[in-house]
């Protein structure tokens, strides 16, 4: 009886750990160096086809001003979606989650994310870290 109880407790503990591991599926998709002059072709390519439901942006070094962002999906027609991003992100600040790929019936792989923007208030280039949640 004791061995059955031990096995049951072990299985429950294992299930609890596996559900915690899946609950936080956040991955750093990449980092973009933001130039000091306004640039509209900053591209973060996703080398492996990845379904991403939402992203967060972090200003790792320096302040950033953004004027736009788009996500591109790996499809026959290279579909894209404009994203609502904040106009400025201060150093060390992380945005809230920005939803993408909201069509749950048609799971599309993200191939790249493009940004328009630049570094402000710094002589060094700011770094924009992109975190994805699938």
Swiss-Prot record:
The keyword Nucleotidyltransferase does not apply. It holds the Pfam family DUF2541. InterPro entries: UPF0412_YaaI (IPR020240). Residues 1-23 form the signal peptide. Coiled coil: none annotated. Keywords: Signal. Belongs to the UPF0412 family. HAMAP family: UPF0412 (MF_01372). This is UPF0412 protein YaaI.
């Amino acid at each position: 009886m004791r061995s059955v109880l031990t096995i049951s407790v072990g299985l429950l503990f294992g299930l609890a750990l596996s559900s915690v591991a899946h609950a936080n599926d956040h991955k750093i998709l990449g980092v973009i160096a933001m130039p000091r002059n306004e640039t509209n072709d900053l591209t973060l390519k996703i080398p492996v086809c990845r379904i991403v439901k939402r992203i967060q942006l972090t200003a790792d070094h320096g302040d950033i001003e953004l004027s736009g962002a788009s996500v591109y999906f790996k499809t026959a027609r290279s579909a894209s979606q404009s994203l609502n991003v904040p106009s400025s992100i201060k150093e060390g600040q992380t945005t809230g989650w920005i939803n993408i790929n909201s069509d749950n019936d048609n799971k599309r792989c993200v191939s790249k994310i493009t940004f328009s923007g630049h570094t402000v208030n710094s002589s060094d280039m700011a770094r924009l870290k992109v975190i994805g949640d699938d």
